[in-house]
Amino acid sequence: MVEEIGPENVVHVVTDNGSNYKKACKELLSEVYEHIAWTPCLAHTVNLMLKDIARRPEHGVIIKQCKRISNWLHNHGQLNTMMRNAIGGELVKWNATRFGTNYMFLESIYRKRDRFMQWMASTEFQHSKWANTEDGRFTHASFASMEWWDALKYIIDTVQPIYKFLRFADQDKKPNICEVVMAYQTIKQELRSFFGTNVSTLKEYIQVVDERLGDVFIGTYVGPGKHVCSSIFKLY
């Protein structure tokens, strides 16, 4: 592609974050076209941040439970119809690769919290053939527990700054690097505000953000060791 356009006409290459793209571009540009910078796709980078955070134990437990509940609700036509009538709509579908969508999925469950709780306690559900199944009892126990809902809300709240960054990165008008830096600073400020004195967890979240954004910034004048905005990589 660079040869077709002409190396003299190219100053920057943006690709997917796949390891094959990353390795090939870094080797090619460093060895052959030293004047050309490479950065990964910003939206894909932020999506991978959410993937990393989803591996955290407190996230993994809730995500696994919500997937189990969602699969049960969608694998039985009559049950799914009953659910949609009870909560007044449908849930956002789980997606194995779109991690931003997956937190929308969690949020769609939480938004219907009151209706789910009413449905689980209703005569319609309690007298249905689904109520005494293993998944039915699990779903009822989860939806009847305020601790479970609080845990779900915590998971959603912890990723809100990063999820907003994903929407910013995935907009039709592609942001420039200055806008990215400003959005990055906003993430850190919002995470600080949320975690407060829980400095150790704050550092872990910001480390995920920094490690993923490293490749985005490294090819610009705001990367580590560069003379502009060198302080942006401080942990907190």
Tell what function each PLM region has.
Residues 1-236:
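A eukaryotic "domain-edge + linker/cap" signature
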